Amino acid sequence: MYAVLVTGGKQYRVVQGETLRVEKLDVETGGDVTFNSVLLMGGSDGIHVGEALKDASVTAKVVAHGRARKVRIIKFRRRKHHMKHQGHRQYYTEIQITGISGPAKQ
């Protein structure tokens, strides 16, 4: 069974046992988090699609918090001998999917 969930403004296709990096979540390492905004679920009983499936959720365990690789930004003005350097490291949370519960059978 797989599901498509929304977190941090992005959509992720997940299966049970998968580990992935999402935008930073305010949950302690080792804690559990539940995602209720599930857009699609698929499995042996067919595909369920909806704007936000009712009674569908994905549970995950927080494995670690961290920061991604540095993105370097350089702003340059030609012929003016002007250059500006800037860097950014995005925070992320690494989660492991522990369970996917589907909507009620109709």
Curated annotation (Swiss-Prot):
Transmembrane segments: none annotated. Keywords: Ribonucleoprotein, Ribosomal protein, RNA-binding, rRNA-binding. Pfam families: Ribosomal_L21p. One of its GO terms (cellular component) is cytoplasm. One of its GO terms (molecular function) is structural constituent of ribosome. InterPro entries: bL21-like, bL21-like_sf, Ribosomal_bL21, Ribosomal_bL21_CS. PROSITE patterns: RIBOSOMAL_L21 (PS01169). This protein binds to 23S rRNA in the presence of protein L20. Part of the 50S ribosomal subunit. Contacts protein L20. This is Large ribosomal subunit protein bL21.
